[in-house]
């Protein structure tokens, strides 16, 4: 039976209704080198904040300059942003919760906190090389991750990013960074990774980094029951044919992903966003579908290979860490069902600021 006792309790929202947002800007170098998962995992687990939204950006020179201007007291960071090539792909994560700006700033660090022993995210994921012979002159500076120092700076940066999110963000394209043909594939980080603030969501992304694929799409969302019915529609006939309680098993899958069983909902309730947090990722590169499926592992975690997502993070056939599309055709079908192209980044920010 695929309906484990108590999962509804474990996966109910664990965040209070806080009213402050902050953000982190994961730099192009950190994104390209597969550091985004480590950054996300530590950020969530250390802060206890909600991952409110996020988006891949390819910011223009104008946006980079204006973002730099919102960061006071971080001269190196401001100069770094202004010096980035326009269109360099980066990842913006928006965190929500009590004292979000102060918590995020403390965890990420700033220009003056990059020579410690891993106390801040910049310690671990950034690099600062200074020349002792030249009076501490900066030889190399790569922050890895950038955060505003105050709620006012966070609000200014978020408004700027929200306004640019249509034209400079979304599901981007990294084909030019690979030789030969590429394809895109979809991953869903499942709700079991969000039972409490922990490193698991970042750990999933971290393990996918070994594929060498480019992360070109990122969207936290809540699957509705109606979307779940359509998404998992193709497996209903199989379950009904193979199992005496096949339909009940199918409803359990949808309830796990959305928070409610279809038979418990009115037609109107089915269309509402679910209660269970998920994150959709788009990866791009040669043979992306096959590479992601290999890194994901067998549906049953007990049979999954060592080092795969499902071996590391799964516990049952249903609660198994992540979903990945099994064909290019299903990538198109599944991304359409969850409305991945829709930009809710700016609406979520506008609703809170």
What are these model-predicted stretches?
Residues 13-353:
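Non-catalytic terminal and connector segments of soluble metabolic enzymes
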